[in-house]
Protein backbone atom coordinates (compact mmCIF):
# COMPACT_ATOMS: atom_id res chain seq x y z
CA UNK A 1 0.00 0.00 0.00
CA UNK A 2 2.81 2.45 0.89
CA UNK A 3 4.58 1.55 -2.31
CA UNK A 4 1.46 2.34 -4.34
CA UNK A 5 1.05 5.70 -2.58
CA UNK A 6 4.71 6.59 -3.21
CA UNK A 7 4.34 5.64 -6.87
CA UNK A 8 1.19 7.76 -7.21
CA UNK A 9 2.95 10.68 -5.53
CA UNK A 10 5.83 10.46 -8.04
CA UNK A 11 3.36 10.42 -10.93
CA UNK A 12 1.56 13.49 -9.54
CA UNK A 13 4.86 15.36 -9.22
CA UNK A 14 5.85 14.39 -12.76
CA UNK A 15 2.46 15.49 -14.10
CA UNK A 16 2.72 18.82 -12.26
CA UNK A 17 6.24 19.38 -13.62
CA UNK A 18 5.03 18.78 -17.16
CA UNK A 19 2.47 21.56 -16.75
CA UNK A 20 5.14 24.16 -15.91
CA UNK A 21 6.04 26.54 -18.75
CA UNK A 22 9.31 25.67 -20.45
CA UNK A 23 11.16 28.09 -22.75
CA UNK A 24 11.71 27.02 -26.34
CA UNK A 25 14.87 24.99 -26.81
CA UNK A 26 17.88 27.20 -27.32
CA UNK A 27 16.07 30.37 -26.26
CA UNK A 28 16.15 31.94 -22.81
CA UNK A 29 12.84 32.49 -21.08
CA UNK A 30 11.60 36.08 -21.39
CA UNK A 31 12.11 38.21 -18.28
CA UNK A 32 8.53 39.46 -18.42
CA UNK A 33 5.48 39.68 -20.65
CA UNK A 34 6.86 42.67 -22.54
CA UNK A 35 10.05 40.75 -23.39
CA UNK A 36 7.86 37.90 -24.62
CA UNK A 37 5.92 40.42 -26.70
CA UNK A 38 9.13 41.79 -28.19
CA UNK A 39 10.12 38.26 -29.26
CA UNK A 40 6.71 37.73 -30.89
CA UNK A 41 6.97 41.19 -32.56
CA UNK A 42 10.23 40.00 -34.14
CA UNK A 43 9.04 36.47 -35.01
CA UNK A 44 5.81 37.71 -36.62
CA UNK A 45 7.82 40.33 -38.56
CA UNK A 46 5.77 43.26 -37.29
CA UNK A 47 8.88 45.34 -37.94
CA UNK A 48 8.59 44.59 -41.66
CA UNK A 49 5.91 47.30 -41.80
CA UNK A 50 5.90 49.09 -38.45
CA UNK A 51 9.73 49.12 -38.23
CA UNK A 52 11.56 48.08 -35.05
CA UNK A 53 10.63 51.36 -33.35
CA UNK A 54 6.94 51.26 -34.25
CA UNK A 55 6.88 54.52 -36.22
CA UNK A 56 5.42 52.74 -39.22
CA UNK A 57 5.75 54.08 -42.72
CA UNK A 58 6.18 52.20 -45.96
CA UNK A 59 6.36 48.44 -45.70
CA UNK A 60 5.42 45.27 -47.52
CA UNK A 61 1.72 45.88 -47.00
CA UNK A 62 1.70 49.61 -47.70
CA UNK A 63 1.91 52.47 -45.25
CA UNK A 64 1.74 51.02 -41.74
CA UNK A 65 0.32 53.19 -38.98
CA UNK A 66 2.55 54.51 -36.21
CA UNK A 67 2.28 52.41 -33.07
CA UNK A 68 3.93 55.27 -31.18
CA UNK A 69 1.03 57.56 -32.03
CA UNK A 70 -1.78 55.01 -31.88
CA UNK A 71 -4.80 55.70 -29.72
CA UNK A 72 -5.88 52.06 -29.71
CA UNK A 73 -6.60 50.37 -26.38
CA UNK A 74 -5.18 46.99 -25.42
CA UNK A 75 -8.37 45.25 -26.56
CA UNK A 76 -8.33 47.10 -29.89
CA UNK A 77 -4.67 46.21 -30.47
CA UNK A 78 -5.46 42.55 -29.71
CA UNK A 79 -8.32 42.57 -32.21
CA UNK A 80 -6.26 44.38 -34.86
CA UNK A 81 -3.34 41.96 -34.55
CA UNK A 82 -5.64 38.94 -34.51
CA UNK A 83 -7.98 40.12 -37.26
CA UNK A 84 -5.88 42.50 -39.34
CA UNK A 85 -7.43 45.60 -40.89
CA UNK A 86 -9.94 45.10 -43.70
CA UNK A 87 -9.05 46.92 -46.90
CA UNK A 88 -5.39 47.33 -45.92
CA UNK A 89 -2.21 45.26 -46.01
CA UNK A 90 -2.37 44.60 -42.24
CA UNK A 91 -2.64 40.79 -42.09
CA UNK A 92 -4.62 38.73 -39.62
CA UNK A 93 -2.58 36.55 -37.25
CA UNK A 94 -5.42 34.46 -35.77
CA UNK A 95 -6.16 31.13 -37.43
CA UNK A 96 -9.79 31.10 -38.55
CA UNK A 97 -10.20 34.88 -38.52
CA UNK A 98 -13.45 35.84 -40.25
CA UNK A 99 -14.38 32.14 -40.49
CA UNK A 100 -14.63 30.51 -37.07
CA UNK A 101 -13.56 33.74 -35.33
CA UNK A 102 -15.71 36.82 -35.94
CA UNK A 103 -13.54 39.90 -36.46
CA UNK A 104 -14.55 43.55 -36.16
CA UNK A 105 -18.11 42.19 -35.86
CA UNK A 106 -17.81 40.79 -39.40
CA UNK A 107 -17.55 37.39 -41.04
CA UNK A 108 -15.68 36.54 -44.25
CA UNK A 109 -18.92 37.02 -46.15
CA UNK A 110 -19.45 40.48 -44.61
CA UNK A 111 -15.94 41.71 -45.40
CA UNK A 112 -15.84 40.24 -48.92
CA UNK A 113 -12.99 41.46 -51.13
CA UNK A 114 -11.74 43.73 -48.34
CA UNK A 115 -10.52 40.73 -46.31
CA UNK A 116 -7.04 41.33 -44.91
CA UNK A 117 -4.21 39.09 -46.06
CA UNK A 118 -3.35 36.01 -44.01
CA UNK A 119 -0.12 36.37 -42.02
CA UNK A 120 2.83 34.11 -42.75
CA UNK A 121 2.65 32.79 -39.18
CA UNK A 122 -0.39 32.40 -36.97
CA UNK A 123 -0.13 33.48 -33.34
CA UNK A 124 -1.68 31.90 -30.27
CA UNK A 125 -3.98 34.16 -28.22
CA UNK A 126 -1.33 34.58 -25.50
CA UNK A 127 1.19 35.67 -28.16
CA UNK A 128 -1.25 38.28 -29.49
CA UNK A 129 -1.76 39.54 -25.93
CA UNK A 130 2.01 39.65 -25.38
CA UNK A 131 2.47 41.79 -28.51
CA UNK A 132 -0.26 44.16 -27.32
CA UNK A 133 1.41 44.44 -23.91
CA UNK A 134 4.76 45.08 -25.58
CA UNK A 135 3.32 47.84 -27.79
CA UNK A 136 1.64 49.50 -24.81
CA UNK A 137 4.69 49.28 -22.52
CA UNK A 138 7.54 49.99 -24.90
CA UNK A 139 6.22 51.76 -28.00
CA UNK A 140 2.92 53.64 -27.61
CA UNK A 141 3.28 57.24 -26.48
CA UNK A 142 7.06 57.35 -26.82
CA UNK A 143 8.98 60.18 -28.44
CA UNK A 144 11.45 59.67 -31.25
CA UNK A 145 13.42 56.39 -31.20
CA UNK A 146 16.78 56.57 -29.46
CA UNK A 147 19.95 54.58 -28.91
CA UNK A 148 18.80 53.00 -25.65
CA UNK A 149 15.59 51.69 -27.23
CA UNK A 150 17.50 50.44 -30.26
CA UNK A 151 19.98 48.52 -28.10
CA UNK A 152 17.08 47.13 -26.06
CA UNK A 153 15.55 45.80 -29.29
CA UNK A 154 18.64 44.59 -31.18
CA UNK A 155 21.27 44.12 -28.47
CA UNK A 156 24.69 45.74 -28.06
CA UNK A 157 26.31 43.84 -30.92
CA UNK A 158 24.09 45.36 -33.62
CA UNK A 159 25.44 48.12 -35.83
CA UNK A 160 21.87 49.15 -36.64
CA UNK A 161 21.93 51.38 -33.56
CA UNK A 162 25.06 53.33 -34.56
CA UNK A 163 22.92 56.05 -36.17
CA UNK A 164 21.22 56.68 -32.82
CA UNK A 165 24.49 56.57 -30.90
CA UNK A 166 25.67 59.69 -32.73
CA UNK A 167 22.40 61.44 -31.82
CA UNK A 168 22.46 60.74 -28.08
CA UNK A 169 23.18 63.71 -25.82
CA UNK A 170 26.48 63.99 -23.99
CA UNK A 171 26.34 62.05 -20.76
CA UNK A 172 25.21 58.75 -22.23
CA UNK A 173 22.13 57.01 -23.48
CA UNK A 174 18.67 58.13 -22.50
CA UNK A 175 15.30 56.49 -22.70
CA UNK A 176 12.15 57.98 -24.09
CA UNK A 177 9.74 58.77 -21.32
CA UNK A 178 6.11 57.91 -21.75
CA UNK A 179 3.82 60.86 -21.03
CA UNK A 180 1.89 60.51 -17.80
Model regions and ranges:
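N-terminal secretory signal peptides that target proteins for export/translocation
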Residues: 1-9
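Juxtamembrane/transmembrane-helix boundary motifs in multi-pass membrane proteins
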Residues: 8, 31-35
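Bacterial N-terminal signal peptides
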Residues: 12-23
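His/Cys-centered metal/cofactor-coordination and adjacent catalytic loops
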Residues: 27-28, 66
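Flexible coil segments in periplasmic/lumen-exposed cytochrome c-class electron-transfer proteins
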Residues: 29-32, 43-44, 52, 91-180
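Gly/Gly-Pro-rich "capping" loops immediately C-terminal to redox-active cysteine motifs
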Residues: 38, 51-120
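Structural motif
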Residues: 44-45, 85
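Short, cysteine/histidine-rich loop/knuckle motifs that typically chelate Zn2+
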Residues: 48
